[in-house]
Amino acid sequence: MVHLTGEEKAAVTALWGKVNVDEVGGEALGRLLVVYPWTQRFFESFGDLSTPDAVMSNPKVKAHGKKVLGAFSDGLAHLDNLKGTFAQLSELHCDKLHVDPENFRLLGNVLVCVLAHHFGKEFTPQLQAAYQKVVAGVANALAHKYH
């Protein structure tokens, strides 16, 4: 559960309505793989990840980034039940994929950076603070199965 004020929730929802999930998802996942290269080990089947340009232009990275942000969108629609919303993904990432749950926090922080880049001055410090709460809540929900 994420504790947002009514104003924060409205601002988060309003901005998210402007997000191009295809573009932002691919960029966020791509940046995660470039900035934290050890995360690439979970994506060995994606082909060429040998350079930042290769990562950022990789169609499988873009497609999976879109999928990730689709799940994030579901989370935004269920902020009062993030653990329930992400229960299956938490189980998959823990039991089958063995993803270090710290990676969820890293991806959330990268997503906030990408949103700031895309929205510039519209992404105010107050909106950033609200999004940090959301990505922390999502990361916590995804890590729930690990506890």
Curated annotation (Swiss-Prot):
The protein's GO terms of the molecular function aspect are:
haptoglobin binding; heme binding; hemoglobin alpha binding; metal ion binding; organic acid binding; oxygen binding; oxygen carrier activity; peroxidase activity
Q: How does it assemble?
A: Heterotetramer of two alpha chains and two beta chains.
**Which sequence positions carry the modification called Phosphoserine?**
S45
Any one GO cellular component localisation term in the record: haptoglobin-hemoglobin complex
Q: Does the keyword Phosphoprotein apply?
A: yes
Q: Where is the Globin domain?
A: 3-147
Tell me the organism: Ateles geoffroyi
Which amino acids does the record list as binding heme b?
H64, H93
Please list the residues that carry the modification N-acetylvaline: V2
Where, by tissue, is this protein expressed? Red blood cells.
Residue list for modification Phosphothreonine? T13
Quick one: which gene encodes this? Answer: HBB
Q: Which PROSITE patterns match?
A: GLOBIN
InterPro entries reported in the protein's UniProt record: Globin, Globin-like_sf, Globin/Proto, Hemoglobin_b, Hemoglobin_oxygen_transport
For this UniProt record, the keywords arranged alphabetically read as follows:
Acetylation, Heme, Iron, Metal-binding, Oxygen transport, Phosphoprotein, S-nitrosylation, Transport
Query: What is the similarity comment for this entry?
Result: Belongs to the globin family.
Name used for this protein in its record: Hemoglobin subunit beta
Q: Tell me which domain of life the UniProt entry assigns to the organism this sequence originates from.
A: Eukaryota
Q: Which residues carry this modification: S-nitrosocysteine?
A: C94
List modified residues, type N6-acetyllysine.
K60, K83, K145
**Pfam families registered for this protein in UniProt:** Globin
The role this protein plays is: Involved in oxygen transport from the lung to the various peripheral tissues.
* Alphabetized Gene3D superfamilies for the sequence: Globins
| GO BP terms, alphabetized | hydrogen peroxide catabolic process
